[in-house]
Amino acid sequence: MRRTTLLIAALLGTVVPACASETAAPAVEKRASDDGRLMPPEKLTEHVWYMRQPERLWSAVIGNVLIIEQSDGVVLVDSGGSVEDGRDVVRAVAGLTSKPVKSIVVTHWHNDHPLGIPGILERFPKARIIATAKTAELMADPEVLGVGVGKPDPKRLRTREEGSRQRSEEYRKMAANPSVPEDVRAEYRAEATWILERLRRQTENYVVVPAETFTDKLLIDDPAVPVQLLNLGRANTKGDALVWLPRQQLVATGDVVVSPTPYGFVSPIAPWLATLDQLERYSFRTLVPGHGPVQRDRSYLATLRWSMNDIRRQAIDLAKTGATPEQAQDKFDTSEHHKRFGADNAWKKRWLDGYWLAGMFDTAFNQAAGVPLEPGSDGGEE
């Protein structure tokens, strides 16, 4: 497999079609699926809805938003990837209940999950902002998220705008390349448009650092819908929070689980698998991933586990041969991964390779070869 150049910055730099469900908020209008916005809320069970981006493999991604109605207010899990996304969430909540948003839980620091908070605080300034201690620490560093902390940073916003416009133009060029299959060219055209639509909605972005943190667990109690916040261990990031609704048997995982293409980049595999071990001890019937449609069984978790174990196995075997990292990447057999994750064309393979396989294999190979992992927001030793 050739080394893929998509890194975590590509995911966060800007920043599977679905129709409005029968339970969608009437305040959210029907619209095109490529306008850079979250889809209307879908009801999962009594008092619980979620919002997600259109079912495509966009690079300018938006994390899922969970809406939980308790007796005295609404708990949100994540907020979208822009101030405008947060305002959309507020409108969606207003279409479901007259209760205020009382808490916003941040599952992890990646931009597409916490940057909607300012738009929500405009309407609900007293809402609690909650995250793990590690996530709050990372969000307080402007070098990590690349946007201002506490207020917009015009210089950083210009830098991100330039990067987005450059990526959009690159995709338009790929879409015009006659050697690229037409189905893939169509995806490039749509992606180029989506990036610019997301950019249009990101002109006010900045970080609100969570004022309330936890290390292991925290309870937001309620007679009907108690919400348990959990830190089960390191996985996609060093500070992942999961949300468990025991009476509804529903778990929201943040990017610990993402479908149809998992996100991994530079995270070590062993602690991630250990976190999945902890997750599977819960008796959930519904899993809300950080991206993608809800899951009603554990088959995708099994695929995710298989992929991690196979990446690690191949990395160990190749490290024993004395291969260089570049040689190992070239010999890394991704065919079964493409098959199991449904990457059946060049477009889907691009995202699976870039968002998951390349970075995860690099990290696993370096560990197997005894190369110290570079420290960073998500990387570094276990």
Predicted features, each with a name:
Residues P41-G95, A241-D255:
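Conserved beta-strand hairpin/beta-sheet module of binuclear metal-dependent hydrolase folds
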Residues A224-Y282:
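Active-site-proximal loop/helix segments of hydrolase catalytic cores
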Residues K43, Y188-R189, T203-L245:
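Core dinuclear metal-dependent hydrolase active-site scaffold
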Residues L7-V16:
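Bacterial N-terminal signal peptides
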Residues D35, K320-E382:
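C-terminal regulatory/interaction regions
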